[in-house]
Amino acid sequence: MQKKGANISLKGYDDIFSTEQSRAEAQQERVQEIPLSELHPFEGHPFRVVDDEEMMKTAESVRDFGVLTPAIVRPDPDGGYEIVSGHRRHRASELAGKETMPAIVRDLDDDAAIILMVDANLQRESILPSERAFAYNMKLHAIKHQGQRTDTRFTGPIVIAQ
C-alpha cells in the first residue's frame, strides 16, 4: 500500500505578516498616469469624438490644467488598455500635446464595461438621438447577457392601470 503525501498549502510571508489595512489598500483602485500610446478606444464605442469647437476648448483646458477627471480603462489581453470612459479626454490630451493621461484601471468583463461606458456617456447633453438609441440597445443586450438587472431604479414613467 502506497502512502499518500499530505496536501499542505502554506501561505507566503507577506500573507501571514501583512495587516488587514495593507491588504485592503492593495485592492483599492488607484489613479495611474498611462501613456496615451497604450490607450485605445472601446470596440464598438457608439459615440463620435469630433474635433469641433467644444473639443478645442477641452484641449485648451487640458493643456492649461491637465485632465481633471481620470478616465476608466480596462486591461487589454493584447496589450495596453481599452478606454471604457474618457474617449473625449483622451482625444483632448492628444490635441494638447500630452504624453500621459490619468486613468483608473478596472477589471471589467465585456458586459460590465458596456454598461459603464453607456451610463457614463449618456450623462452628456450633446448626444445625437441615433447615438443615444444605439447606446441603449448596447446596454440592453449587455444586461440580457448578464441575465440580471444591474440596478433597481426604474427611470421610466410610472403608468397605473385601472
Model-predicted regions and their roles:
Residues 123-162:
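Alpha-helical interaction elements
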